[in-house]
């Protein structure tokens, strides 16, 4: 009887597979990382070059280029990678689709390159979170929580331009450009009066409040393991089995500060709540922007409230309406003649009948 002995030599591909999926590496790569790393590198390199040296972009498609780079007079606050031209619309616009490199730059090609590689990269990062959790035997909720900011990036860079019909409506990649996007979004969609945005505000601000409350309660109820002359941080050893703070004391304090049932007596349910509150809020905001992308806008109160004598009762809705009209008038000043919201009178026919002769 003969036995076959397999050679101990491992192929290069097997070595690569073992390295990619090895959880003992200082930084886990994973199969999603194989996609993530080149995409994020491409997006980052192109973004830096464009922010420094990209020529002006004809964002509105009316031959009035907008400069966004350092070399054309911007600083870190005003600079941005300008979205691709309205003349391109929703067309996929890689470098090889343009006749020349100058044309590609003039029409805002770098914006699409950065955004598409960035979205693929951050999506792969979420997959990598799941992959590492799976290999370590952990539960998958880390990538679920990360899906909230991922969805926010998806809606402002992809879904909103799709709904509006052009990547020129996407969010510029810069500080002032982001603020401009927010103001124009409010002017055109009244996002402040959208219930999903309100839930998102509650999620973000509430999450900040709960995080501060939790951190301060834990810090205030640490189990003392050190002397008065030492920092309390030295009382914790990484991996120790004992609780580092007294949850009973924290529970008792908070229950007396507000009322008993406002305080969690289960550490697991407490931390789930701390994670779920902001995540659900950001998901709602993303859904709100996705609906407004297709012009299902926030509540509008275009008609002022009148009293019995027909006089206007001033409300904050009136202030918001005037602010929206002002922002709409100011943005893209040369792209359209007059905002339709301000055209309150009926249009008169110009040449529907022939003039009388003789």
From Swiss-Prot:
Mod. after translation: Tyr-160 forms a radical intermediate that is referred to as redox-active TyrZ, YZ or Y-Z.
Site, Tyrosine radical intermediate: residue positions: 160
Transmembrane segments: 28-45, 117-132, 141-155, 196-217, 273-287
The protein's Enzyme Commission number: 1.10.3.9
InterPro entries in alphabetical order: D1/D2, Photo_II_D1/D2_sf, Photo_RC_L/M, Photo_RC_L/M_CS, PSII_D1
Binding site for pheophytin a: 125
Ligand binding (chlorophyll a PD1): 197
Binding sites annotated in the UniProt record for a quinone: 214, 263-264
Propeptide: 344-358
Annotated GO CC locations: photosystem II; plasma membrane-derived thylakoid membrane
GO BP of this protein: photosynthetic electron transport in photosystem II; response to herbicide
Annotated site, Stabilizes free radical intermediate, chain positions: 189
Membrane topology: Multi-pass membrane protein
Keywords of the record: Calcium, Chlorophyll, Chromophore, Electron transport, Herbicide resistance, Iron, Magnesium, Manganese, Membrane, Metal-binding, Oxidoreductase, Photosynthesis, Photosystem II, Thylakoid, Transmembrane, Transmembrane helix, Transport
Example of a GO MF term: oxidoreductase activity, acting on diphenols and related substances as donors, oxygen as acceptor
Keyword Electron transport: yes
Co-factor note (free text): The D1/D2 heterodimer binds P680, chlorophylls that are the primary electron donor of PSII, and subsequent electron acceptors. It shares a non-heme iron and each subunit binds pheophytin, quinone, additional chlorophylls, carotenoids and lipids. D1 provides most of the ligands for the Mn4-Ca-O5 cluster of the oxygen-evolving complex (OEC). There is also a Cl(-1) ion associated with D1 and D2, which is required for oxygen evolution. The PSII complex binds additional chlorophylls, carotenoids and specific lipids.
Binding site for Fe cation: 214, 271
Note: Cyanobacteria usually contain more than 2 copies of the psbA gene.
Name the record gives this protein: Photosystem II protein D1 2
Lineage of the organism: Bacteria, Bacillati, Cyanobacteriota, Cyanophyceae, Synechococcales
């Amino acid at each position: 009887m003969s036995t076959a002995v397999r050679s101990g030599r491992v192929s290069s591909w097997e070595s690569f597979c073992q390295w990619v999926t090895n959880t003992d590496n200082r930084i886990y790569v994973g199969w999603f990382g194989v996609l993530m790393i080149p995409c994020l590198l491409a997006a980052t390199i192109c973004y830096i070059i464009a922010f420094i040296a990209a020529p002006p972009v004809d964002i509105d498609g009316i031959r009035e280029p907008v400069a966004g780079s350092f070399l054309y007079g911007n600083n870190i606050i005003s600079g941005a990678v300008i979205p691709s031209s309205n003349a391109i619309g929703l067309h996929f616009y890689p470098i090889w689709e343009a006749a020349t490199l100058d044309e590609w730059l003039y029409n805002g090609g770098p914006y699409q390159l950065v955004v598409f590689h960035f979205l693929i990269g951050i999506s792969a990062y979420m997959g990598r979170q799941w992959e590492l959790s799976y290999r370590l035997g952990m539960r998958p909720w880390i990538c679920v929580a990360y899906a909230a900011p991922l969805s926010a990036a998806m809606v402002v860079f992809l879904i909103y331009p799709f709904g509006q019909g052009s990547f020129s409506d996407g969010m510029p990649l810069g500080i002032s450009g982001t603020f401009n996007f927010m103001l124009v979004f409010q002017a055109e969609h009244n996002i402040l009066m959208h219930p999903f945005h309100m839930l998102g505000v509650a999620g973000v601000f509430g999450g900040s409040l709960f995080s501060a409350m939790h951190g301060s309660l834990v810090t205030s109820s640490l189990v003392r393991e050190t002397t008065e002359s030492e920092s309390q941080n030295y009382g914790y050893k990484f991996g120790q089995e004992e609780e580092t703070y007294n949850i009973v004391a924290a529970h008792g304090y908070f229950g007396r500060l507000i009322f008993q049932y406002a305080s969690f007596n289960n550490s697991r349910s407490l931390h789930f709540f701390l994670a779920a509150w902001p995540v659900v809020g950001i998901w709602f905001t993303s859904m709100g922007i996705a609906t407004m992308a297709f012009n299902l806008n926030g509540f509008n109160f275009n008609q002022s409230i009148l009293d019995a004598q027909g006089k206007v009762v001033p409300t904050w809705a009136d202030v918001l309406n005037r602010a929206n009209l002002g922002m709409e008038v100011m943005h893209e000043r040369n792209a359209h003649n007059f905002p339709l919201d301000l055209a309150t009178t009926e249009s008169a026919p110009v040449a529907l009948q022939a003039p009388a002769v003789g």
